[in-house]
């Protein structure tokens, strides 16, 4: 199987960019703790570590400024982060169907079509918006998104123990990407309180094919 990892589509969401390079380093280190030789004998790993380089380099302290009532922004770094969009002001994570950007056209023709990956991992981070969980994750929600076997495997077998390990080893709470209903409703009033009790449930975004995660 071929696994494609795409990171850095939104500048400022740097965890995936750093993490996938660390993974590649550890896999290529002979005798590493990850058993790199064994893993790479069974799959091909294709990594696009920084899909939005122009946005990544447009660093400014005003980008992603923290604003809790609107559930947006992030804390630090003091020097600022890059922009969510590319140099042409296109949100690349809304361009998977249109192919308006040069970056997306090249990714599709030279990476996606060339490698025909069996599984794609799209690395984002929620430090551009405020959530109650320290870490969030997601899988496609529709049957049209791909084969059900990997979706069910990730949802039911892979992520539950990852969630438990994060809590046990690092004290971090993790959950599905989205927000609580109370938080979303309070956005219209501009008075979100992340400490308010949760009673009405949880909601997520519409899983349209223009998003890379679908």
Region locations from a protein language model:
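Structured catalytic-domain cores with a bias toward divalent-metal coordination
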Residues: 1-214
């Amino acid at each position: 199987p071929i696994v494609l990892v795409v990171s850095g589509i939104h500048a400022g969401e740097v965890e995936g960019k750093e993490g996938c390079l660390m993974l590649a380093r550890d896999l290529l280190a002979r005798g590493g703790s990850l058993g790199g030789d064994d893993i790479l004998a069974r799959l091909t790993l294709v990594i696009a570590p920084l899909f939005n380089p122009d946005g990544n380099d447009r660093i400014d302290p005003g980008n992603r400024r923290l604003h809790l009532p609107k559930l947006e922004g992030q804390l630090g770094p003091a020097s600022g982060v890059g922009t969510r969009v590319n140099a042409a002001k296109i949100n690349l994570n809304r361009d998977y169907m249109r192919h308006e950007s040069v970056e997306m056209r090249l990714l599709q023709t030279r990476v996606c079509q060339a490698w025909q990956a069996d599984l794609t991992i799209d690395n984002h981070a929620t430090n551009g918006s405020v959530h109650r969980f320290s870490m969030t994750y997601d899988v496609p929600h529709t049957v049209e998104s791909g084969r059900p076997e990997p979706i069910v495997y990730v949802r039911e077998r892979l992520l539950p123990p990852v969630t438990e390990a994060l809590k046990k080893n690092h004290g971090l709470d993790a959950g599905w990407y989205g927000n609580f209903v109370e938080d979303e409703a309070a956005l219209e009033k501009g008075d979100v309180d992340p400490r308010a009790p949760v009673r009405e449930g949880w909601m997520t975004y519409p899983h349209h094919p223009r998003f890379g995660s679908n």
